């Protein structure tokens, strides 16, 4: 497995694989890898000849400098895991490699509406940072396929629209959220939970599943469902942050034409912000 830190070497290796007719997959990450990331990698391994994983803690998508400073950097451990899973190349650039002129003078990629609604409303600039760095990685790697988890659902839809709008010749493969045996969505943030918080954390997905079951049975009073969910989260020990039920394709409010809904939940548990989502088929 190659570990590459610079753009020229990355391009050299990609050029070689292209000349050999290889099918290339890109899995963008910020490191601190867990089994959810490994599922992305394993899915890519089954569909491509070459798997490239980027590890870059993107400063552009952090709203608060202290969050950026606290984000775990575990490159050695990450590379060991990726080697065991048969990854061909890890691209782990420094900030200067991605933003050689600094972020103040960087050209941005902004996806209208999707970047400022829902979670984007409370994290101004976050999704612009995501779309900019992913666009840059796409330009550098020029993959045939790219892999994103469904856990960050708004991010997934944002990248999907960016690929369509900018005419990237890239197939986006979405991979279902990986959960532990209690139903808790795997996340790097779970490492920040105390023992008591770990015990409480699965309640988030249980409450979400309860909403999904009611909607699958025909319930459409979404505001009432969300009010009940907020009360249940409070009772369980969470501080609700953002609770939405939206059209899964557009993330707009549900309407009579919506075929699939997505329940989007974010809540604080102690000092950790937990997020989760679940899609619901509305056509049955």
From Swiss-Prot:
Q: Write out the pathway annotation from the protein's UniProt entry.
A: Cofactor biosynthesis; (R)-pantothenate biosynthesis; (R)-pantothenate from (R)-pantoate and beta-alanine: step 1/1
> Which reaction is this enzyme known to catalyze?
(R)-pantoate + beta-alanine + ATP = (R)-pantothenate + AMP + diphosphate + H(+)
Q: List, alphabetically, the GO terms of the cellular component aspect.
A: cytosol
Binding residue positions for beta-alanine: 61
Q: Which residues bind ATP?
A: 30-37, 149-152, 178, 186-189
**What EC number(s) does the entry state?**
6.3.2.1
SUPFAM superfamilies, per the entry: Nucleotidylyl transferase
Q: Which Pfam families match?
A: Pantoate_ligase
Location (main, coarse): cytoplasm
UniProt-annotated binding residues for (R)-pantoate: 61, 155
Per the Swiss-Prot or TrEMBL record, the active site comprises 37 (proton donor)
Alphabetically, which GO biological process terms does the record hold? Answer: pantothenate biosynthetic process
Query: Which residues are listed as membrane-spanning?
Result: none
InterPro entries from the xrefs? Cyt_trans-like (IPR004821), Pantoate_ligase (IPR003721), Pantoate_ligase_C (IPR042176), Rossmann-like_a/b/a_fold (IPR014729)
Q: What class of enzyme is it?
A: ligase
Q: Which GO terms describe its molecular function?
A: ATP binding; pantoate-beta-alanine ligase activity
Task: Tell me where in or outside the cell this protein is found.
Answer: Cytoplasm
Q: What else is known?
A: The reaction proceeds by a bi uni uni bi ping pong mechanism.
State the protein's purpose.
Catalyzes the condensation of pantoate with beta-alanine in an ATP-dependent reaction via a pantoyl-adenylate intermediate.
How does this protein assemble? Answer: Homodimer.
> Which family is this protein grouped under?
Belongs to the pantothenate synthetase family.
The protein's name in its UniProt record: Pantothenate synthetase
Q: What species does this protein belong to?
A: Photorhabdus laumondii subsp. laumondii (strain DSM 15139 / CIP 105565 / TT01) (Photorhabdus luminescens subsp. laumondii)
